[in-house]
UniProtKB/Swiss-Prot annotation:
Its main location: cytoplasm. One of its GO terms (molecular function) is glutamate-5-semialdehyde dehydrogenase activity. The lineage of its organism: Bacteria, Pseudomonadati, Dictyoglomota, Dictyoglomia, Dictyoglomales. It is an enzyme of class 1 (oxidoreductase). Coiled coil: none annotated. Its EC number is 1.2.1.41. It comes from Dictyoglomus turgidum (strain DSM 6724 / Z-1310). It comes from the Bacteria. PANTHER family: DELTA-1-PYRROLINE-5-CARBOXYLATE SYNTHASE, GLUTAMATE SEMIALDEHYDE DEHYDROGENASE. It holds the Pfam family Aldedh. This is Gamma-glutamyl phosphate reductase. The gene is proA. Gene3D superfamilies: Aldehyde Dehydrogenase, Chain A, domain 1, Aldehyde Dehydrogenase, Chain A, domain 2. Belongs to the gamma-glutamyl phosphate reductase family.
Length: 415
C-alpha cells in the first residue's frame, strides 16, 4: 500500500512540472520515447514472447493472445503513432473563447491538463505506449495498471519510456506502472481521490462496470464493443459483403469489430446464404434468430444472452428484422454505445439511423473498424468513451484536457 501511495505522490508532484512545459519540450520527450522503443524492439519482443508463452500455458484464446502480441510490425506502427501525435497541435493553453464584458474585463476559457490519469486495462500492451504519449503531450501524468497477462511487456515498455525521459525536460516520474497483479490493488487505486483526477478503464463490459461500481475517483467509461451492422433492403450486396467481412474478421478481438448482423426481412432469403458462405470461409461460427435458422438450418440458435455478448472472437449472431425501426430499437436495447453501421442507398433512412442510434460512432456504408484515434486523425487514443459527458468516442489530446475560466482585468471591482 505504501509503495502504491509513493508512486501516486511522485506522479502528482511531477504533473505540476509537466504542466509548465511548452510544446517543443513535450515533443522532444515523445521523440526520445519513439527512438528508445526503436532501439529496443528485440528486447520488447523477447519479453512479449514470455507473456505469450505463459498465456498459451494458461489456455488463453487465440483472440486474447492476438491482443497481447507485439511483433516488429506492430511496434513500428506504435512508433509511427508517436510521430503522428508529435505532429498534432497541443491543446494546452488554448483559449477556447474570450469575450469582453461591459465593464471591460475579458472572460475566457483556457484548456489545461486534467492532472493525473490512471488507466486500467486488460491484455493490450500497445495501450501502455498510446496512453503515455497522449497523457504527456496533453500535460498529464499517467499511472498504468495493465493486465497480468501482459505484465512482462508492460514493464519493459515502461522502463524503456522512463529511460528515454531521463534525458528530457519531462520528469520520468510522470509515468508510473503498478506492477502488482493483485485485484485488490486496483480497488485501492480507485479510492485515491487525493492523487488521481480521473480513471479510464479499458476491457470487457463486465470489467468496466466493476470499475465504475467501486471507484471513488471519477471514471470515464470506455467501450466494450457489442457492435451491429444493419443491412437495409436496398443495400448493395457487394458493398455489404465487403464491409461485413472486414468488420468481423479482419481483427475480431478488438472493440470496433462487429458482433451482430441485422438483415431486413425482404432480402434475407437471398442475402443470408451469400454472407453466411463468406463468413464460413473464415471459420466464423454463426448464431441466429428463429427466422435466420429457417434459412441457415445449420446455424446455432441465438439466446437472449447472445444479443448482449461481445464475443471478441470468430462468432457472429444474426437477426432478421421487419424494418429499420426494429433494427434501431434492437440496437439501442442491446448495444454498448460504441460503433454501429447501416448499409443503405436511401439518404433518409441513413439520416434516420444517424440520428436515432445511440452510439459514440455511427456509420453509413463503412466498416466499424474505423473507430480508432489514428483513423479519426487523433494520432492515437487513450480509449473510446461510450458515455455522454466530458468525452464521447475516441479520446485524443483535447479530450485529456479540461478548461478553466481566465479573467483579465485592469483594476475592475464589482459594484
Amino acid at each position: 500500500m505504501e509503495n502504491l501511495i509513493e508512486k501516486l505522490k511522485k506522479a502528482k508532484v511531477s504533473s505540476y512540472t509537466l504542466a509548465l512545459l511548452n510544446t517543443n519540450e513535450k515533443n522532444e520527450a515523445l521523440r526520445a520515447i519513439a527512438n528508445n522503443i526503436e532501439k529496443n524492439i528485440d528486447k520488447i519482443i523477447k519479453e512479449n514472447e514470455k507473456d505469450l508463452k505463459r498465456g498459451e500455458e494458461k489456455g488463453l484464446s487465440k483472440a486474447v493472445l492476438d491482443r497481447i502480441l507485439l511483433n516488429e510490425k506492430r511496434l513500428r506502427d506504435i512508433i509511427k503513432s508517436i510521430d503522428d501525435v508529435i505532429k498534432l497541435p497541443d491543446p494546452v493553453g488554448e483559449i477556447v473563447s474570450m469575450q469582453k464584458r461591459p465593464n471591460g474585463i475579458l472572460v475566457g476559457q483556457m484548456r489545461v491538463p486534467i492532472g493525473v490519469i490512471a488507466i486500467i486495462y486488460e491484455a493490450r500492451p500497445n495501450v501502455t505506449v498510446d496512453a503515455t504519449i497522449l497523457a504527456l503531450k496533453s500535460g498529464n501524468a499517467i499511472v498504468l495498471r495493465g493486465s497480468s497477462d501482459a505484465l512482462n511487456s508492460n514493464i519493459i515498455i515502461t522502463e524503456i519510456m522512463k529511460e528515454a525521459l531521463s534525458n528530457t525536460k519531462v520528469p520520468p516520474d510522470t509515468v508510473q506502472i503498478i506492477e502488482s497483479p493483485e485485484h485488490s490493488v486496483v480497488e485501492e487505486l480507485l479510492q485515491m481521490v487525493d492523487y488521481i483526477d480521473v480513471a479510464i478503464p479499458r476491457g470487457s463490459a463486465k470489467f468496466i462496470k466493476h470499475v465504475m461500481n467501486i471507484s471513488k475517483v471519477p471514471v470515464i467509461e470506455t467501450g466494450a464493443g457489442n457492435n451491429h451492422i444493419y443491412v437495409e433492403e436496398d443495400a448493395d450486396f457487394e458493398m455489404a459483403r465487403k464491409i461485413i467481412i472486414n468488420a468481423k474478421v479482419q481483427r475480431p478481438s478488438v472493440c470496433n469489430a462487429i458482433e451482430k448482423l441485422l438483415i431486413h426481412k425482404n432480402i434475407a432469403e437471398e442475402f443470408l446464404p451469400i454472407i453466411a458462405k463468406d463468413l464460413r470461409e473464415y471459420n466464423v461460427e454463426i448464431r441466429g434468430c428463429k427466422r435466420t435458422l429457417k434459412i441457415l438450418t445449420d446455424a446455432i440458435p441465438a439466446t437472449e444472452e447472445d444479443w448482449y455478448t461481445e464475443y471478441l472472437d470468430y462468432i457472429i449472431a444474426i437477426k432478421i428484422v421487419e424494418s429499420i425501426d426494429e433494427a434501431i430499437e434492437h440496437i439501442n436495447k442491446y448495444n454498448t454505445k460504441h460503433s454501429e453501421a447501416i448499409i443503405t442507398k436511401d439518404y433518409y433512412k441513413a439520416l434516420k439511423f444517424l440520428r436515432m442510434v445511440d452510439a459514440a460512432a455511427v456509420y453509413v456504408n463503412a466498416s466499424t473498424r474505423f473507430t480508432d484515434g489514428g483513423e479519426f486523425g487523433l494520432g492515437a487514443e487513450i480509449g473510446i468513451s461510450t458515455q455522454k459527458l466530458h468525452a464521447r468516442g475516441p479520446m485524443g489530446l483535447k479530450e485529456l484536457t479540461t478548461t478553466k475560466y481566465v479573467i483579465l482585468g485592469e483594476g475592475q471591482i464589482r459594484e
